[in-house]
Amino acid sequence: MRKRFLGAILLALGIGLFGGWGSAQANSVAEPTQSMLHVCWLKDAHVNPAACEVVRMPDAFEPAKAVVTSSVDFPDFQVVALDLREVSADGYPVFNVQSIYYKDFLRATEPIIIVMRDSESFPRNGIAVRDSLGRERIFGIAISGEDGSLLLSEVDRN
């Protein structure tokens, strides 16, 4: 528990210091893609777990189960592993991104459960989708330092 609390504090500091996880979020015009994607803990979701597809991350931490939903269908959906590679000269973290799971579409009617890797100060779990302009968008799944809920934040890839 102490380790998780410390992780939440470091996460909050990281968000405060970096203004988000990546320059993509900080420098782009707000686009509805992020607001159409939703993530929450399985215990807080209003879904039938037996009806959901489950994706298990390598080195998954069994209690850490997130549900990803969307309000629209997104093509080229991926569950990705994120590893911090470096912090850019501008102070933004840059991640190595490894695809763990691919699905042609994340459908609004088909939530997906992700059994996540344990995460400390930076997100280690994420999702990627193709937006309406055909661009790949990568979002880290992070734990809020305020209330422990899950957050999506756009990240930069290596």
Protein language model regions, located:
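Extracellular beta-sheet/turn segments enriched in Thr/Pro/Gly and aliphatic residues
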Residues: 56-57, 142-158
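Solvent-exposed serine/threonine-rich low-complexity stretches and specific carbohydrate-binding patches
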Residues: 92-106, 142
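Bacterial N-terminal signal peptides
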Residues: 9-19
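Bacterial N-terminal signal peptides that target proteins for export
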Residues: 1-9
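Boundary of Sec targeting at the N-terminus
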Residues: 25-29, 34
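Short, surface-exposed binding/anchoring microloops in extracellular/periplasmic proteins
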Residues: 44-86
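Short, solvent-exposed, Trp/other aromatic-anchored flexible loops in extracytoplasmic proteins
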Residues: 100-129
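Short, exposed beta-strand-loop hairpins at the edges of beta-sheets
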Residues: 128-148
